[in-house]
């Protein structure tokens, strides 16, 4: 799929399909309003019959409408004028793209000026438009042997403001974010035999090629052992695939400026180890590396956007499988920062590899650390797949997270983290246990475990994307109904912006 922003009068274009928009009726206007005045007049019968109501995401397709240079016309609802937001535009663009695809055309135009009429923040709507279209275009079918969806669709976003500097910059930002999210989605969707720790590391290296000021370093098993990462090594013992530790460094500010640090869990497949998972749904455990994939995407986006910030992305990657060398319940390992932990359940392994990554992040003395992980089933019970739960005790970072999430349109929910949760993670024979001695609160106690590997005074937030890392398309139309979502990449970029 190709997208571009054209500085043109929409009526001068020739194209198989045109997308215009409708807005719901109001006290002033008894009928819904189509945002293109001539098409509004031509569709008055449909408006009077309520075929077009302007309801958000309503899609009405007029085949063979033959308006000027357009063969088909698609009318997509924006909802009520005063309820149009950046997120609602993303979702309307998802409806627009699906309608374009259903028409089986190779080219379409979007009447962007119909969205921005009377709106001061045209640039923000341009960003949302690009994001919505590109995110919806994602399809993972490369492993199919039969007919694949390969038809190229060119979508022109047409506006008389197409040469406006702010509008162009925002559209390009949305296009970068959308493409990077799709890059990370693909990493998550690849099955475990085609997405090993080595392949994940190679993907980070490949994705960073040609991007200025972005460096990728990959530690192999020997280096990981030398660096005393006992958590990552311990989990990897049960697999023939060697672990990898991925370090992505972006230099966008003065060398004296401390970095912001993003940490991701990269479990490319997790059977649970000796504490083996039930068979039902185990195939979805290829998604246990989505936190890592999304941190890779975050660093790619920050670098492509040339943000004036120093940023580091760290991904600890391994498989959690079973062989004669696998970690056993009761085994004790030592993390990079010297703390010891009992592995009382080998299926609580993500926190063990994150322990080493967070310890390393602390050594960088960053301005803040944020981590992302498909960490606990308890988070799915608590919040389902609508919100990403996050934990932080730092009020300033909490404010930044909430602001960033509001800007990105991703839903987050602040979860409790207290000293009582820390107490529940104390070990009997080691400093810590990797599972709680208390009842319930599995997500909070997991966060409490991670907190023990973050340096005192460093602002830190933990995002548990177990419920939002994949299969969220029932709520978000620009996400696949099945498959990786790319959760939190856009929010993390917005967090990074606040440190520029």
From Swiss-Prot:
GO cellular component: cytoplasm
Positions bound to Mn(2+) 1: 270, 347, 349
Top-level lineage group: Bacteria
The EC number(s) this enzyme carries: 3.4.11.1, 3.4.11.10
Enzyme class: hydrolase
Keywords: Aminopeptidase, Cytoplasm, Hydrolase, Manganese, Metal-binding, Protease
Similarity annotation: Belongs to the peptidase M17 family.
Protein name: Probable cytosol aminopeptidase
